Amino acid sequence: MKKLKLHGFNNLTKSLSFCIYDICYAKTAEERDGYIAYIDELYNANRLTEILSETCSIIGANILNIARQDYEPQGASVTILVSEEPVDPKLIDKTEHPGPLPETVVAHLDKSHICVHTYPESHPEGGLCTFRADIEVSTCGVISPLKALNYLIHQLESDIVTIDYRVRGFTRDINGMKHFIDHEINSIQNFMSDDMKALYDMVDVNVYQENIFHTKMLLKEFDLKHYMFHTKPEDLTDSERQEITAALWKEMREIYYGRNMPAV
């Protein structure tokens, strides 16, 4: 895409939001409580603040304010307000490729924010536990928050990821013509590294004329031992392993497709 000469500030708003899910099987009530306590501590407000602060570093934002809170009985939220950092637009990379892990990228941001909320969840029947984190990176300026996507997904390793990216508003060039997007994008997948693409099955649902892009990701490899909390698969009977595997896989497919499915 040809570089634009703008009249004034770049008024486009670029928002990246995604949900990550971690699935676990806990055999007893004590194990379920233990998993919730473990995942709640792993992604507490302090750790999330570190991750989001590093995200700000990647996209070159100045942190204005940090609001963070751990909740009882579980969950956490962090919101960071960031400000613009002047930069020569000629230095901004607008090509479609994966972002750093991490690597300094200079950005020009204004009226922007980064936030995350966590939602640990379990049910007394079935032994299934889920952890969901909602993350949003919203910027107003010349760089897309997609540059932080690669880093964030690697930091929050998960079984299922749903990603939405949208460009809103318009900016004008020096001739007064409106521009509703200022960079090329065909798929969110083009901003992911090859190792990530190898790990997940992905599907896109894009509405190009509205500048809306959506990608869903489901982990390819399924190893039961990675989904058990304080229970070893070898300590279970064959029928128990099959039953738990079927329950976990059904849970993951329901979350991935966003609908309830009949038992197989």
From Swiss-Prot:
Pfam families: AdoMet_dc (PF02675). Keywords: Allosteric enzyme, Autocatalytic cleavage, Decarboxylase, Lyase, Magnesium, Polyamine biosynthesis, Pyruvate, S-adenosyl-L-methionine, Schiff base, Spermidine biosynthesis, Zymogen. The active site is at S112, H117, C140. The modification Pyruvic acid (Ser) is found at S112. Is synthesized initially as an inactive proenzyme. Formation of the active enzyme involves a self-maturation process in which the active site pyruvoyl group is generated from an internal serine residue via an autocatalytic post-translational modification. Two non-identical subunits are generated from the proenzyme in this reaction, and the pyruvate is formed at the N-terminus of the alpha chain, which is derived from the carboxyl end of the proenzyme. Pathway: Amine and polyamine biosynthesis; S-adenosylmethioninamine biosynthesis; S-adenosylmethioninamine from S-adenosyl-L-methionine: step 1/1. One of its GO terms (molecular function) is adenosylmethionine decarboxylase activity. Optimum pH is 7.4. Active from pH 6.7 to 8.5. GO terms for cellular component: cytosol. InterPro entries: AdoMetDC_fam_prok (IPR003826), S-AdoMet_deCO2ase_bac (IPR009165), S-AdoMet_deCO2ase_core (IPR016067). It catalyses: S-adenosyl-L-methionine + H(+) = S-adenosyl 3-(methylsulfanyl)propylamine + CO2. Transmembrane segments: none annotated. Binds 1 pyruvoyl group covalently per subunit. Spermidine-deficient mutants show a small decrease in growth rate and increased sensibility to superoxide toxicity. PANTHER family: S-ADENOSYLMETHIONINE DECARBOXYLASE PROENZYME. Catalyzes the decarboxylation of S-adenosylmethionine to S-adenosylmethioninamine (dcAdoMet), the propylamine donor required for the synthesis of the polyamines spermine and spermidine from the diamine putrescine. Belongs to the prokaryotic AdoMetDC family. Type 2 subfamily. NCBIfam families: SAM_DCase_Eco (TIGR03331). Heterooctamer of four alpha and four beta chains arranged as a tetramer of alpha/beta heterodimers. This is S-adenosylmethionine decarboxylase proenzyme. It comes from Escherichia coli (strain K12).
